[in-house]
């Protein structure tokens, strides 16, 4: 049998033997102490931040409960989902899904990445290669940007600035302005995108598209 096979067989034997032993006793076995933490899914958060959140002591074992560990990771601002699993004999695997940034927004005097909830996250902006718009740190602005990103990604890539104007949202970029209600639906945004494509197909430019009205998009400053 190969060395790897011997190791696997040994682990299996220990686990089977452990069926007759309490988890408390197995926690004291050095073989099952956590020696490595593997982080998966982190794009913006630094892995060391996630590992530190686990607060693992020197005696931490794979037989410790993992639910509490996942809760600690989930508590980090910017983590949407967290799961902690074991890989025998001594590795913890931390898998996270992060909230997706939709804009850059100012927070305490510096620009940070803002998600679609309007939260400015503890993410390093340089870790996102996309060119994101600069936006007001506002939940309604973030929500509309998130919907535009999902429903009309081509329109989203042209947005440079996003702001709240009264009850409405103003998006601008490339010499174009888009007006939307703060509660704009996917259907409203798709209607706006359809007009953008129609005008481009006919070689027409415009200054502003006003999509604040149901089933209507008003074009202002259109070139003939």
Locate predicted features.
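Charged, solvent-exposed interaction patches on well-folded alpha/beta domains
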Residues: 1-38, 45-75, 81-224
């Amino acid at each position: 049998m190969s060395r790897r096979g011997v190791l696997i067989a040994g682990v299996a034997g220990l686990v089977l033997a452990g069926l007759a032993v309490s988890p408390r006793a197995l926690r004291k076995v050095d073989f099952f102490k956590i020696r490595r933490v593997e982080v998966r899914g982190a794009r913006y958060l630094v892995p060391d931040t996630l590992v530190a959140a686990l607060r693992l002591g020197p005696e931490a074992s794979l037989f410790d409960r993992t639910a509490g560990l996942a809760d600690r990771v989930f508590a980090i601002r910017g983590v949407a989902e967290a799961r902690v699993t074991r890989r025998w004999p001594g590795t913890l695997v931390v898998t996270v899904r992060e909230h997706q940034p939709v804009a850059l927004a100012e927070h305490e005097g510096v620009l940070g990445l803002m998600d679609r909830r309007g939260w400015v996250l503890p993410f390093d902006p340089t870790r996102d290669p996309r060119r994101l718009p600069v936006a007001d740190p506002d939940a309604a602005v973030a929500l509309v940007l998130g919907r535009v990103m999902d429903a009309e990604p081509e329109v989203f890539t042209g947005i440079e600035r996003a702001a709240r104007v009264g009850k409405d949202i103003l998006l601008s970029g490339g010499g174009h302005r888009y007006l939307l209600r703060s509660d704009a639906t996917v259907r409203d945004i798709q209607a706006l995108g359809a007009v953008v494509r129609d005008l481009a197909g006919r070689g027409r430019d415009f200054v502003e598209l006003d999509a604040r009205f149901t089933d209507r998009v008003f074009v202002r400053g259109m070139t003939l």
